[in-house]
């Protein structure tokens, strides 16, 4: 047996005597085992000790940290070690090694820390494996841990249903019930799928169920959550339900904001209740709130189609005064209805005025609008 091989075996046995040798196939241990095989299989190793590979920085860091974790280490010690790692692979090696030590078991805080480290390092496969371990009961339940899992699952298309599996497990627990953050994450994820009207109705049932369960669990929604519920109803044109939630906001100590009113204005206008939409818009003005661009444009087009042209023009000027620019469809809708109502010359004057107030319009769009008005007037 060569001197080099004896030194390596002595080093390994010393680590074992300290109960520090990891029994799993970590990155660092794999590298060390490779060096053993290269020594035993290469005939030159008996005569050339200089050919033995030096340890990588990852191996050195791993050995340093496991030596710092003295026998009898606690979950707090492991959490500190995990948080100190900038390399998620090294953190996972430490996490797996500590889990195999006699008398120790990871708690929810250790799993939470490791999952966050893996997410930060974009080790999504590691994260999914850890999540399955948690769901299988590898550690006790914890609201922060489960919310972290739900956040990750909601952000990944193929894990969307898994987020609700975790939520249902929280519902069945005695001491880890869903909190406001849980419902915020789930509702936000559902709302991202409200992109088409027929799809909206599919997910609206889930929104209703979450809302009922939130109330039954005694979770008080904030303005952000209530706005998401209002938005869900408004996008499905369930405007009476949206208005009901709007009126309940005061019961929860929440104040409606510009988003609340914008969702309501768009919803009732798309439902055909333009007068009610204008009423919400004026209520916003009284409170000093400014609608977003899409709210403005839906209201302008709805008023124009209802031949309430003076009110539509007034909203256009208010939109421009708030440094927001209508799109070409909105401009065309107003101008077309003006020309159809025999107010063609007024339409030409408005195009000139809008060009002065709208820096985004540009010369090309201005010419397009003027040509459209001339064409409509000739017809």
From Swiss-Prot:
One Gene Ontology cellular component annotation held by this UniProt entry: mitochondrion
Annotated PPR repeat ranges: 142-177, 179-221, 222-256, 257-291, 292-326, 327-361
Major localization class: mitochondrion
Localization of this protein: Mitochondrion
A Pfam short name: PPR_2
InterPro entries: Pentatricopeptide_rpt, TPR-like_helical_dom_sf
Domain of life: Eukaryota
Cystine pairs: none
Keywords, comma-separated and alphabetical: Mitochondrion, Repeat, Transit peptide
Family: Belongs to the PPR family. P subfamily.
Name the record gives this protein: Pentatricopeptide repeat-containing protein At3g25210, mitochondrial
Organism: Arabidopsis thaliana
């Amino acid at each position: 047996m060569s001197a080099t091989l004896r030194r390596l075996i002595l080093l390994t046995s010393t680590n074992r005597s300290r109960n520090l040798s990891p029994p799993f196939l970590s990155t660092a241990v794999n590298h060390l085992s490779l060096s053993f095989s290269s020594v035993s299989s290469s005939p030159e190793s008996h005569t050339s000790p200089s050919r033995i590979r030096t340890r990588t920085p990852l191996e050195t860091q791993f050995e340093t940290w496991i030596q710092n974790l003295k026998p009898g280490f606690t979950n707090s010690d492991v959490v500190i070690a995990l948080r100190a790692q900038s390399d998620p692979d090294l953190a996972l090696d430490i996490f797996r090694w500590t889990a195999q030590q006699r008398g120790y078991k990871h708690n929810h805080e250790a799993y939470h820390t490791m999952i966050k480290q893996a997410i930060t390092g974009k080790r999504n496969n590691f994260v999914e494996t850890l999540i399955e371990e948690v769901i299988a009961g590898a550690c006790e339940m914890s609201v922060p841990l489960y919310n972290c899992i739900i956040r990750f699952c909601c952000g990944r298309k193929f894990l969307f249903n898994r987020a609700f599996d975790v939520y249902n497990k929280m519902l069945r627990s005695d001491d880890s019930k869903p909190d406001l953050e849980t419902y915020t994450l789930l509702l936000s994820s559902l709302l991202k799928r409200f992109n088409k009207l027929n799809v909206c109705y599919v997910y609206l049932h889930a929104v209703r169920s979450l809302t009922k369960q939130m109330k039954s669990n005694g979770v008080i929604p904030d303005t952000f959550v209530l706005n998401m519920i209002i938005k869900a109803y408004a996008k499905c044109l369930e405007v009476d339900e949206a208005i009901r939630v709007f009126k309940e906001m005061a019961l929860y100590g929440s104040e409606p904001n510009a988003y609340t009113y914008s969702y309501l204005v768009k919803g009732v206008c798309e439902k055909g209740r333009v007068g009610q939409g204008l009423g919400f818009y004026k209520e916003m003005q009284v409170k000093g709130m400014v609608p977003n661009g899409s709210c403005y444009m839906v209201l302008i087009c709805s008023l124009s189609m209802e031949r309430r042209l003076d009110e539509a023009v007034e909203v256009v000027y208010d939109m421009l005064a708030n440094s927001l620019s209508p799109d070409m469809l909105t401009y065309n809708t107003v101008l077309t209805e003006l020309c159809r109502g025999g107010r063609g010359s007024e339409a030409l004057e408005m195009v000139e005025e809008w060009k002065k107030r709208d820096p985004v319009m540009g010369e090309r769009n201005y010419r397009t609008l003027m040509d459209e008005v001339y064409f409509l007037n000739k017809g």
